[in-house]
Amino acid sequence: MNLQHHFLIAMPALQDPIFRRSVVYICEHNTNGAMGIIVNKPLENLKIEGILEKLKITPEPRDESIRLDKPVMLGGPLAEDRGFILHTPPSNFASSIRISDNTVMTTSRDVLETLGTDKQPSDILVALGYASWEKGQLEQEILDNAWLTAPADLNILFKTPIADRWREAAKLIGVDILTMPGVAGHA
């Protein structure tokens, strides 16, 4: 089972405060473990423009049609001070990993320098932190019914309203997650 370029969808019974009702985009999955980014947990009061200001990055030349007021996500509980940018190609940045034909993860400053300009990738998601699982840990959590899995969908990853991503990701595999046991008051 290789879950790279898949979503992990938290089951309703998963009550961990970070992973409750989360959708995790799996960036890497191999025999050593897995690494992913939570894509539906916005950090309070932190937008992309705020990250650029903190890093003293000024988009040049500024393309006013590109919105920089999108929220930054809590990507996971590890390295919460480190940025991870999921985006569509190109992948010609200093530190990029191609996850699929249409998805790239970049951790270098040069991608941030394109934000708000005509050189910005067409779709972006900025996160601080990541989630990881040791060898066999994720597979066991799936067997323990902590997660559903679904092939990743770029519309959900980049365009679906954040509050709807959990439910929409489950719909990819025909599940209405709000009617599952463990979701009180939504049946």
From Swiss-Prot:
Residues annotated as transmembrane = none
Pfam families assigned to the protein according to its UniProt record, in alphabetical order: DUF179
What is any one of the record's Gene Ontology cellular component terms? cytosol
Identify its protein family: Belongs to the UPF0301 (AlgH) family.
What is the name of this protein?
UPF0301 protein YqgE
Organism from which the protein derives: Escherichia coli (strain SMS-3-5 / SECEC)
* Gene name tied to this protein: yqgE
